[in-house]
Swiss-Prot record:
Top-rank taxon, per record: Bacteria
CDD domains: LbH_THP_succinylT (cd03350)
Subunit structure: Homotrimer.
Keywords: Acyltransferase, Amino-acid biosynthesis, Cytoplasm, Diaminopimelate biosynthesis, Lysine biosynthesis, Repeat, Transferase
Broad enzyme group: transferase
Phylogenetic placement of the source organism: Bacteria, Pseudomonadati, Pseudomonadota, Alphaproteobacteria, Hyphomicrobiales
InterPro entries associated with the record: DapD_Trfase_Hexpep_rpt_fam (IPR005664), Hexapep (IPR001451), THP_succinylTrfase_dom1 (IPR023180), THP_succinylTrfase_N_sf (IPR037133), Trimer_LpxA-like_sf (IPR011004)
Name of protein: 2,3,4,5-tetrahydropyridine-2,6-dicarboxylate N-succinyltransferase
EC number in record: 2.3.1.117
Protein's cellular compartments: Cytoplasm
Pathway: Amino-acid biosynthesis; L-lysine biosynthesis via DAP pathway; LL-2,6-diaminopimelate from (S)-tetrahydrodipicolinate (succinylase route): step 1/3
A cellular component term, taken from the record's GO annotations: cytoplasm
Organism: Bartonella tribocorum (strain CIP 105476 / IBS 506)
Length: 286
């Protein structure tokens, strides 16, 4: 039996008996939860992993470990803010106790105002502008997390992703069966866009400014008429749009309903050679 399998068994059993767990709980359960969160924090394990077939496998027991930590940890003063600012919370800062050597080894840039909670992993060459990374999240190498962006609990952000200013990536710990929101490698998410409810943005996709995608959002390919729910195909260029509404009872035209529109699809080489503005400008002016 592997070490991770042992941890999983302990966490699963503890979660089934979670009503008996509180801030006074000691021993194996507390040690297992704390160790699991430490492994998440270091990026040695992650809540979701992409399989060879392109599907994502979610380790539900890791989400359960995060939830158990809220029962185990009391409210306390959290230090580490700018100019000695502190908070009242159950989750310490990822940077608690860090010194220059720790930041050097981590290899990412964190500007003043960036908040990362313990158990979130940030890979080398990531740039964190003033932003918020919630617990259990995974931000892979070379990604830009721009100003006022939020990366929700257990969200998975790929390599060389650009999350523009004010972007919201949804978190999902409850309901427990829900999957985390996933942004795959080389995606561009435009300013003030939102991706939530376990939706997946596939590799190389471009979302223009102000695109909102949840599990009820219709994502319509303008060329083929195909409708996607919960997933944007790879190398798609997506902008906000609307669908004609049903007529009102009095026969008048009903209000249009929001949708997201795939205005074009490109191959990997075109995506690499073409600027984001060029990809969006040509089609949105039609």
């Amino acid at each position: 039996m592997t070490h991770l399998t042992q941890l999983e068994i302990i966490i699963e059993k503890a979660f089934d008996d979670r009503d008996s767990i509180n801030t006074t709980t000691k021993g194996e359960i507390r040690e297992s939860v704390e160790h699991t969160l430490s492994l998440l924090d270091k990026g040695e394990i992650r809540v979701a992993e992409r399989q060879k077939n392109g599907q994502w496998y979610v380790h539900q027991w890791l989400k359960k470990a995060v939830l158990l930590s809220f029962r185990l940890n009391p409210m306390q003063i959290i230090t580490g803010g700018i100019n000695g600012t502190h908070w009242w919370d159950k989750v310490p800062s990822k940077f608690s106790g860090w010194k220059e050597d720790d930041f050097q080894k981590a290899g990412f840039r964190s500007v003043p105002g960036a908040i990362v909670r313990h158990s979130a992993y940030v890979a080398p060459n990531v740039i964190l502008m003033p932003s918020f990374i919630n617990l259990g999240a995974f931000v892979d190498e070379g990604t830009m997390v721009d100003t006022w962006t939020t990366v929700g609990s257990c969200a998975q952000i790929g390599k060389h992703v650009h999350l523009s200013g004010g972007v919201g990536i949804g978190g999902v710990l409850e309901p427990l069966q829900a999957n985390p929101t996933i942004i795959e490698d080389h995606c561009f998410i435009g300013a003030r866009s939102e991706v939530v409810e376990g939706c997946i943005i596939r590799e190389g996709a471009v979302l223009g400014m102000g695109v909102f995608i949840g599990q009820s959002t219709k994502i319509i390919d303008r060329t083929t008429g195909e409708i996607f729910i919960g997933e944007v195909p790879a190398y798609s260029v997506v902008v906000p749009g609307s669908l004609p509404g049903k007529p009102l009872p009095n026969g008048e035209a009903g209000p249009n309903l929001y949708c997201a529109v795939i205005v074009k699809r490109v191959d990997q080489k075109t995506r690499e050679k073409t600027s984001i503005n060029e990809l969006l400008r040509d089609e949105t002016q039609c």
